[in-house]
């Protein structure tokens, strides 16, 4: 016989993980959750974005020019 007080509502955000088991008694509630695996497409997309960002950094580094002020070069000797 279930009483109205015995009802327990448990909500787990499915974006975080998958519920494996839910067990409870009057003293405690235990929820075992496994992390969700990323989809292979999402992982590949993240890797390609990281590679593109790395390429952008290298291009920016190549465009840096060090200018040294050498006064001896500007003076002509007669």
Swiss-Prot record:
GO terms for cellular component: host cell cytoplasm. Induction: Expressed in the early phase of the viral replicative cycle. Transmembrane segments: none annotated. Keywords: Early protein, Eukaryotic host gene expression shutoff by virus, Eukaryotic host translation shutoff by virus, Host cytoplasm, Host gene expression shutoff by virus, Host-virus interaction, Inhibition of eukaryotic host translation factors by virus, Inhibition of host adaptive immune response by virus, Viral immunoevasion. It comes from the Viruses. It is found in: Host cytoplasm. GO terms for biological process: symbiont-mediated suppression of host adaptive immune response; symbiont-mediated suppression of host gene expression; symbiont-mediated suppression of host translation; symbiont-mediated suppression of host translation initiation. The keyword DNA-binding does not apply. Plays a role in the inhibition of host protein synthesis. Specifically, inhibits the initiation of cap-dependent and cap-independent translation. In turn, affects the outcome of infection by decreasing recruitment of inflammatory leukocytes and reducing the memory CD8+ T-cell response. Belongs to the orthopoxvirus OPG173 protein family. This is Protein OPG173. The gene is OPG173.
């Amino acid at each position: 016989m279930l009483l109205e007080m015995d009802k327990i509502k448990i909500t787990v955000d499915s974006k975080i993980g998958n519920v494996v088991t839910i067990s409870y008694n009057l003293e405690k509630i235990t929820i075992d959750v496994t992390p969700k695996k990323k989809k292979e497409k999402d992982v590949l997309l993240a890797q390609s974005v990281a590679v593109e960002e790395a390429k952008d950094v290298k291009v920016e580094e190549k465009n840096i020019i060090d200018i040294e002020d050498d006064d001896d070069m500007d003076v002509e000797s007669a």
